[in-house]
Amino acid sequence: MKLWSDSWINGDRIPPRYAAGRPDGAGRATFSDNLNPHLAWSEVPEGAKSMVLICHDFDVPTAADDVNQPGREVPADLPRADFFHWVLVDLPPRPTVIAEGEFSRGFTPRGKPGPAALHGARQGLNDYTGWFAGHPELDGRYFGYDGPFPPWNDSLVHHYVFTLYALVLPRLPLQGEFTGDQVRQALAGRVLAEATFSGTYTLNQRLLDASV
């Protein structure tokens, strides 16, 4: 099975339009267009009844002490963890494309509605739900796609992986609200094929200047 995108070249830097955050011109960050990228797939195995799409960042700091603190950087040797940006299940194998902006156009404070989604699919909670918990203006239930917004002072470039799974059943056995970890557990023994597509992103001005 193959997965690709017209939004950027596999492994390249993700354009800011597909991110939740972008540089603000003053060394920090602000909200961005937050469009879901175009994604398309082919060579779905015979017998596939549904698709699951997961987007995660595996470079998220496990401690927030230095996150977004002026005059400091999040150290590169800090242990990192997964952060789910999109959890989409029960997607029909056809049509074999997700259009740019079809599932997300802009950042929604307190989160987009869910779990019901287009094409009869369901969207899980992404990890901004936990990140913004307790925030007076942003606390909420974040369903669907919300793109990259890494710390603007992280010394690591973050990596984002879109993984598409073809399943043997039409509906994943999860009820109500669900998370990326719960979907990963539910996939066990039900996957016919999988494919990945990735990109990188940083808001650290030092790293951006070095890449020019």
Positions of predicted regions on the chain:
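N-terminus-centered regions that define maturation/targeting leaders and the start
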Residues: 1-212
